[in-house]
């Protein structure tokens, strides 16, 4: 390092200490490297929920840093030019943080369409369960069942039927127990409703993919300022 570079770095450190003494130290949490994800989005790729979450958290950190620096307005330091280069994007930050619950799940609030689809799935699933609950509680049916419960196989509601009684419960066989003593049968009475739920689940997945694509496109359009922010921070 030449002497000017050393002096500049010392000045930055001194100024950072001075600002922190006056206004408190800005809080930094676990900032992930968002450059790779930002560049992928810029090239048209859909990002994973994990990548989007990291970008949302990074944007929140930039917002926090910008808010902290707003207290220091009017104070010129060797750090001023860096703070003034920060690009805050509250719209994208809020869109991501409000839409994503975890790296595996989007919130219902991610879009009105997603919320509506999920309400329909919930309503139809409840109706199927109620119908099957009546079936398994019926005295005439209980003797055919291995257990009085409703379970799931391949995303469809089924009941566990003793193999020797399979002809007594009209329906579609989806699975067999390891011992072969139990068949998991989807009673014909709920096949159509289960089909409707499956169609809704496909619609739900398509809507999730659309939302992720939309957020990724916004990330892509803001990639350069974000990468610049990352290099500053």
Where are these regions (language model features)?
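Intracellular alpha-helical coupling/juxtamembrane segments of multi-pass membrane proteins
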Residues: 121-124, 204-211, 215-233
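Conserved amphipathic alpha-helical "coupling/scaffold" segments
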Residues: 1-113, 117, 228-233
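Coiled-coil heptad-register positions
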Residues: 21, 70, 136-139, 208, ...
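Ordered, soluble secondary-structure elements with a strong preference for glycine-centered loop motifs
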Residues: 25, 49, 115, 119, ...
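SMC-family hinge/dimerization module
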Residues: 149, 153-184, 194
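Internal alpha/beta scaffold segment
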Residues: 188-214
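Non-transmembrane amphipathic alpha-helical segments
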Residues: 13, 96, 121-124, 128-131, ...
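Extended, Lys/Arg-enriched charged tracts that mediate electrostatic binding to polyanionic substrates
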Residues: 115-165
């Amino acid at each position: 390092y030449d002497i000017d570079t050393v002096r500049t770095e010392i000045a930055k450190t001194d100024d950072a200490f001075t600002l922190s003494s006056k206004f408190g130290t800005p809080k930094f949490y676990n900032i992930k490297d968002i450059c790779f994800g930002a560049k992928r989005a810029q090239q048209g790729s859909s990002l994973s929920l994990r990548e989007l979450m990291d970008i949302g958290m990074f944007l929140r950190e930039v917002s926090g840093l910008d808010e902290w620096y707003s207290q220091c307005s009017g104070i010129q330091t060797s750090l001023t030019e860096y703070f003034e280069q920060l690009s805050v994007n509250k719209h994208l930050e809020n869109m991501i943080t409000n839409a994503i619950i975890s790296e595996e799940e989007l919130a219902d609030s991610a879009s009105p369409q997603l919320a509506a689809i999920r309400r329909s799935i919930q309503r139809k699933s409840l109706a199927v369960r109620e119908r099957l609950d009546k079936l398994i509680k019926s005295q005439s049916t209980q003797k055919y069942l291995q257990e009085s419960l409703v379970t799931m196989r391949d995303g469809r509601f089924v009941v566990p039927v003793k193999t020797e009684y399979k002809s007594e419960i009209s329906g579609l066989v989806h699975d067999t127990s390891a011992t072969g003593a139990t068949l998991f049968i989807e009673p014909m009475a709920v096949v159509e409703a289960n089909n409707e739920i499956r169609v809704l689940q496909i619609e739900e997945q398509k809507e999730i993919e659309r939302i992720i694509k939309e957020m990724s496109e916004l990330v892509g359009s803001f990639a350069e300022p974000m990468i610049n922010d990352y290099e500053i921070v």
